[in-house]
């Protein structure tokens, strides 16, 4: 990114309408400067200050065997500031303060060898949710952002070519594979064959229980669910469920 309000990078894209998702594996990426961004992106327009949701990784040149983080960057308003990893955000705690969702390092590299990292970025309404995975099967939620965008937007691959402040013409590159873009979805309803859960198996006494549903590619999560505590079906006010992100929180005093 050129600065917080103006984008300047390489973007390969296509136009999509309404709900959509992009899934891909980042096979490899070069690192020519600190915090070079590589990943997938939804944009409302091709203007430099467009509203944006971008899922990717930030590499650190001095320690390029691993990623510093896999994170969800966003620009909520046209020509507003983008929440992006930079030199001043040098820890997960600082990223959290800046409102940047991230996950700890995945196994993108083993020494000099690339293992690759999978990305899944989903738009459902005005909610954009990012997931990352080592194998493309078991997904970790990176985070979600609510961004009001038009019905027709762009989706594609974003690579910050970047360049260190020297005379060398050395630019960043990236290789993607296993690319899938979906614009049509099948509702899962109660067909559990297309749903997986992640999160803790239990909660400590007196604390809320949290977990998450993830739908297979090309499927939408159900609009509503029922949860049992013991033999009883909980009333909806006893738990929260977000059909756009799959997040479930059961209140501690309703657990048995």
Residue ranges of predicted features:
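Generic structural detector for well-ordered beta-strands
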Residues: 15, 146-148, 180, 202, ...
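A short, Gly/Thr-enriched small/hydrophobic beta-strand-prone motif that recurs across taxa
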Residues: 186-190
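Extracellular interaction modules
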Residues: 17, 171-175, 242-256
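Extracellular glycan-recognition regions
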Residues: 1-185
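Short, solvent-exposed loop/linker segments at the N-terminal edge
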Residues: 201-207
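Small-residue (G/S/T/A) turn/hinge positions that recur once per unit in extracellular repeat modules
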Residues: 192-200
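Surface-exposed interfaces of beta-sheet-rich extracellular modules
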Residues: 208-246
């Amino acid at each position: 990114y050129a600065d917080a309000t103006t984008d300047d990078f390489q973007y390969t894209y296509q136009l999509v309408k309404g709900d959509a998702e992009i899934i891909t594996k980042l096979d490899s990426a070069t690192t020519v400067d600190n915090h070079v961004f590589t990943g997938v992106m939804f944009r409302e327009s091709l203007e430099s200050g467009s509203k944006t949701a971008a899922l990717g990784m930030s590499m650190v040149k001095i320690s390029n065997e691993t990623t510093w983080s896999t994170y969800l960057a966003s620009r909520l308003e046209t020509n507003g500031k983008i929440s992006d990893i930079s030199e001043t955000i040098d820890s997960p705690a600082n990223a959290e303060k800046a409102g940047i969702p991230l996950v700890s390092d995945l196994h993108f590299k083993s020494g000099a060898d690339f293992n690759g990292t999978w990305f899944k970025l989903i738009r459902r309404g005005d909610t954009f949710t990012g997931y990352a995975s080592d194998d493309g099967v078991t997904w970790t939620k990176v985070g979600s952002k609510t961004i009001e965008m038009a019905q027709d937007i762009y989706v594609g691959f974003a690579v910050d070519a970047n360049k260190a402040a020297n005379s060398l013409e050395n630019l960043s590159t990236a290789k993607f594979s296993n690319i899938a873009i979906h614009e049509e979805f099948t509702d899962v309803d109660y067909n559990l064959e297309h749903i997986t859960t992640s999160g803790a198996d239990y909660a400590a006494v007196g604390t809320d229980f949290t977990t998450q549903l993830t739908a297979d590619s090309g499927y939408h999560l159900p609009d509503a669910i029922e949860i049992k505590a013991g033999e009883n079906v909980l009333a909806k006010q006893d738990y929260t469920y977000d059909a756009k992100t799959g997040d479930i929180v059961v209140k501690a005093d309703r657990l048995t």
